[in-house]
Amino acid sequence: MTRSRSAVAAVTVCLTLVTAAVLGSLLAAEGQTPKRGGVLQSVLIEDPPGLLVHESATVSNVWPMSPCYSNLVFFHPQKPLESADTVIPELAEKWSWQDNYRNLVFFLRKNVRWHDGKPFTSRDVKYTFDVAREAPDAPAKFRLSARKDWWANVEAVEAPEPHTVVFRLKRPQPSLLLMLASGYSPVYPAHVPLGELRQKCVGTGPFKFKEWQRGQSVELERNPDYFIPERPYLDGIKYTVISERGTRLAALQAGRLDAFVPLEMTKAMADAAKKSAPNLVISEVGQNGSDNVILNVKRAPFDNPAVRRAVSLAMDRQGYVQSVRHGGAVVGVGLMPKPLGIWGLSDPELRTLPGYRGSAVDKVEAKRLLASAGFGPGGKPVKVELSTRTLSIYLDVASFVADQLHQIGIEATVKQMDSAAWFPALARRDYQIGGNLTAGGFDDPDAYFFENYKCGSSRNYSDYCNEEVDRLIDQQSQELDRAKRLKLVLEIQRRLEADVARPMLGWRKEYFAHYPHVKNLVPHNALYNYGRMQDVWLDR
């Protein structure tokens, strides 16, 4: 190992040892002795479409499965703003970057067992990520590897020893560590068939699978053999499926729920809940989620660039913030803007872009573009099918988009689809235009760019493709100088907006609610990464 590589490894090892110690004493600053026992009552907005997280693009299975599994590394549960500095060990005791961020070596814990009693080894890690990246020699295959593109830069995953794993990369990529810390990146048991894991969890996490009653609830129970001593504190967790928004809110206000789902509460709902139950703790957080419009560029009329641009110009972004989110959102383009994130375009620059200059000006231009394409008054009528999920948060967006389209002469019929049909339809590109919500695994450009905008990505639902943008995406991913990387990232966002790659309405503020007796459940600035629950306890 060279001197520079040794220095990186030494710093990294030091960091992981310190944070491993912190894992055992997260509560010291609070000055309270945790109480053991009790079942946390939480909620899901829909029945999980399945329990395999790597096949998923929805929080509806990530959230209830997070307590059941473990990652190599994870984001510190008590630090709400995630970064490389908040990544802590989980199944790995420590890690080391080598060869200028081309090789990432993990040294694994030796006292870990799967919930069925089998030992955890490096073979499980290699299996998980070979399947996730669809390696040619992978021993199994997901129905859909939802984030396959996260792992496109991984050349090989090696398991030279039972407790050592090496990720070999094609080029430097510091963000790989953050990807591995995401709630979308649990490690699976190599000895359990994927078909079985679609129905139940066999993990290494703090809670074991108890029961999944379809359409009703998912229940977990304490894992007495969890590898972190004295954890978890809870006896179990119950996630009750309540699909209707008003019924969920009523259950929270009545105290039948201890904590609300980290999604689906608008600012108006949060205000109403607080008024009804003044002791509720409600946190306003950005969770790296955007409401947006997806356009199928292979289907008329959206195969015409002028029509796509007209759609983007038609959207009144400030109107969306007020009417759909009741003030609980900020306007932004390709990445979460300040103050919620750190990578987005500045507000002064946004206001100079078409679609962000003011509703009246932009709608006039939208009508002109439609007319130039032969549509509108005196031309062909435009009737489209606007697809979306049956969830309230999606229907709110779809209704707004349909109204905005109507104002420029496009008549949209909303087609509702449940999640089990929605994601396969998008994967087949079996839609015309969609009202969509996109949430990133963490606040880093790689989390958004690779899966949503790279040519050929499975979650690039519009089939947007610009080879120059692809080149810039790869370039920013391996840039180690933060200022230089930010410059590249801002340029990519400008190009995405110019190309109408995925018209953004805005970036959501979420309102996370729980009662004061719920301790150590801290919402993060990414939706998927704080549901492990090993440190949560009930003060009652």
Where are these regions (language model features)?
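N-terminal lobe/hinge region of extracytoplasmic solute-binding protein
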Residues: 43-99, 130, 200-202
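Structural transition elements
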Residues: 331-372, 391-396
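Long beta-strand-rich cores associated with HINT superfamily self-processing modules
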Residues: 512-540
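Ligand-site clamp/hinge motif
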Residues: 109, 195, 224-271, 402-403, ...
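Extracellular/periplasmic solute-recognition and catalytic clefts
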Residues: 132, 139, 157, 210-219, ...
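Gly/Pro-rich hinge or "lid" segments in bacterial periplasmic/extracellular proteins
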Residues: 69, 73-82, 152, 173, ...
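Extracytoplasmic/peripheral linker and loop segments enriched in polar/acidic and small residues
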Residues: 33, 102, 306, 321, ...
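Surface-exposed binding/hinge segments that line
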Residues: 107, 126, 142-190
